[in-house]
Amino acid sequence: MNTYLKKSCLIFISLFGMSLSLSFAQLSEPLPFMTHAKPLSAEIVDLGMLDTVPSTAALVRLPNRKIVYMVKEQGKWEPFYVKAIETGYWDTRYEKDTDYDSVFADMREMGANTAYVMLHWEDIEPADNRFDYSFADSVVAAAGRQGLKVGWVLFLHAQKERVPSLKPETAWTFHLDDRDSSNYTMQWVKRDGKLYSNIKDILDYGVRPLHVYGHKEIFYRVRRMLYQLARHYRFDETVIGVQLGNEEGFSFLDESDFNPVTAELYKEWMRKTNKTDYAQFKKEAMDWWWQQFTSAYHEGDPYKIISFNLDAAQAEAGDPERVAMTGTSASTYADGNLDVIGTMFYKGWGYKAILGLDHRYNNSYNYQLPILIPSEIGIGRFNSPVWFRHFIAHTLERAAQGFGVYCYGEVRKELPELGDVRNELIRMLKNISLNEDIIWEGLPGPGAVSCQVDEPGVQVSHLNKNGQETLALIYFPEAKEITDSSRVSNLRTLKLNCMTQKERQYKVDIYKNGECIKSNSLSLKAGISRSITVEGIRMDDIVFVSIR
């Protein structure tokens, strides 16, 4: 056998062995509680190495150092900016014989490219170690037929509102250690001095049952389930990632956890850390459990993203009581090894949450994990139009890699009374799509041209693509607080002052409500400002200005 042939055979054998190791890799053994180990995050791939990635989705570092998301479409890598609408228990999953093809076609018609779909642990593991993906696969197939991606919103807990089933008290994961009429795999809570240790009693009283994540019967099963989920969809072109839990943590409604299993974990934590503060125990335990869970997922799939969210963003906002109760905060996303900050933006706590997240991540949103992709920006009943627009603007100006809108039940086509809300979403998604190349690749700050508006109270934020092309976002921050509708609706003419340090001809396109309302060719000289007038602007508008 000649040397060339020998080398070829060795390469083939090596690759074949690597392929086998990938195909038959096993999940690592669970670590003892609070054992230090470096967690596994999603791989970040340099753009030049993208074609070597054995996946259908990946986090990619661009030459400008920004981390972006890309997906493989028909064998070709493409930029992907997440524009998601969430659906699940409180709209489509409560309906009999939901036609997901129709649901996803409707989302696509509105301009979404992703469906965030609620999926329960019991949907894919209906009995212990018996995995069944028939429901999940049918959802994925329908989304694929309609040209949508799927991000799973993976529920672990139960809720009175038929989560995960019509009889949530029968959820098998809460009955792995039943003794003395109590469920030991569930957090025990107190309300008004009364202890609840049984899932039926908790549900009857309206409390949300949550697992003891460190219980030996729960801990390894969550890891196993996440690993299996990751392996099942690793090479699927429709599934782009998963949100690990929906509003999980220690109970945020009541005092917890009075389960003796958790008491033993607390004692173990004290022995291993020489600390005693119970709120600190909750924080460090949550961080460690989520590190182990995310690592298990990435053992199964090193590339697709895993996110998380916290109830109403109250913990991200730094509410002391919520932080102490739940063991979560703005830092949870980094300390818990999440790839994505999947926060929520609603009127109640949204702005304080932004401040809390900025304090923790302001210099790293774009350059290291976790990146920002809010999971729920409320629309319809959950945010007024101006609040919705402003939360989108705050997401864009931080150069996030997408967002999710909550929820489909507020915008679906067959409910004509929701027409105004639906059109609100359509217009916003259209504005974004028309400028998506700058938004996806762009970083905060102006490019070759910077813009200013002289009128008091106007915010101008910039994104730039490689220091050249610019997208300016113009809005009135105070509009969300104004109750005088006539003041808000009064039409204004804004004078947009443009300046560059690079003399040349620029094309300026101005967008509002999903349409280009003005297009100009602007000749700029270095250091000399020129203005463009923008007519017909309301205080609750958001204006997109692209300069190329």
PLM segments and residue spans:
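Bacterial N-terminal signal peptides
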Residues: 11-21
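N-terminal carbohydrate-binding accessory modules
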Residues: 27-112
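Aromatic- and carboxylate-lined catalytic core of secreted/periplasmic carbohydrate-active enzymes
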Residues: 35-37, 46, 393-494, 502-506, ...
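Short, acidic/polar
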Residues: 93-109, 316-333, 384-392
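Aromatic-lined substrate-binding rim segments of carbohydrate-active enzymes
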Residues: 99-184, 189, 286-300
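Polysaccharide-binding and catalytic clefts of secreted carbohydrate-active enzymes
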Residues: 178-348
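Catalytic-core region of carbohydrate-active enzymes that cleave or remodel glycosidic bonds
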Residues: 291-305, 327-410
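C-terminal beta-strand-rich structural cap/linker in extracellular carbohydrate-active enzymes
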Residues: 518, 523-548
